[in-house]
Amino acid sequence: MAAIFKKQFPSTYKLYVEHCKKHASNPSGLLGSTYLIKSESSDPGNSGRENVAYVACMFTSDAFGRRKNSADDIVENTDNSMHHLESQLAELAKTEPIEQQEGVNVVNMPKINAGLFNVPWEETEAVLKKHQVLINVYVI
């Protein structure tokens, strides 16, 4: 997933790496937060778009593989990350054009947590549906 975003939105990837380095001494402090990054118009992922994309980095686990957080913790961190994202989108919508349908903010995302974190998609999906955003889920 990260490789795809790095290729499509290299400007955001650089900022994401810097953000993670700033928090390297306490990566757990990022859990339940979302880092929303505005991409640059020159990023390949913005080709043909009317407005530049924003990339939301949701911190739901601070490790993967055997060291990953429990599924319950990841789902809870997803819920908290979504609350954080919603508040950022509400502020952003006051000054920037963002994708909306019938006045509801739209978020496009892959099936998060289902890959390296091995959380059943249905558990993540149930949390996402609680939030006041329209989510378009795609499979890569």
Each PLM stretch: what is its role?
Residues 1-140:
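Macrodomain-like recognition of ADP-ribose-binding/processing modules
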